Design a protein with these regions (language model features):
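Short amphipathic alpha-helical interaction segments
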Residues: 67-79
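Long, low-complexity, charged/polar intrinsically disordered regions in eukaryotic proteins
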Residues: 1-38
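Short, cationic-aromatic polyanion-contact patches
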Residues: 56, 91-102
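A short, conserved structural fragment
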Residues: 81-91
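Short acidic, hydrophobic short linear motifs in intrinsically disordered regions
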Residues: 42-61
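Eukaryotic partner-binding/assembly regions in large regulatory complexes
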Residues: 1-5, 44-48, 68
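Surface-exposed polar/charged interaction patches
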Residues: 33-36, 40, 65, 83
Length: 102
């Protein structure tokens, strides 16, 4: 597990590179969660574009699947939001469709 101390001792560019290396696995995890939501919406004849997951649920999946700390999962989500890979409204997260899916 990655700890706060281990990350904070590295130079800033190394921290950013390490954080960016988590983009693809995190987006794959998010896509899997969104696919479940889309399937649920299809069952009830809902609009699949409304599929979204909560920030807490996404963080929990990152912690369980990729064994990162809660703090680091939050950093990954914040970084994805800053670069425009995801769209957040309130506590819900969607993929940014302009960027494209995996």
């Amino acid at each position: 597990m990655i700890t706060n101390k281990a990350i904070q001792k590295k130079p800033e560019h190394k921290q950013m590179m390490q954080l960016q290396s988590w983009y693809e696995p995190a987006l794959r995890t998010l896509e899997g969660l969104l696919e479940i939501r889309r399937a649920n919406l299809r069952k009830v004849k809902g609009d699949e574009k409304n599929a979204a997951v909560t920030r807490d649920e996404f963080m929990e999946m990152l912690m369980n699947e990729h064994r990162v700390s809660a703090w680091y999962a939050g950093e990954i989500i914040s970084s994805l939001l800053r670069v425009g890979q995801i769209f957040m409204f309130g506590r819900f997260i969607q993929m940014n469709e302009e960027v494209g899916e995996l």
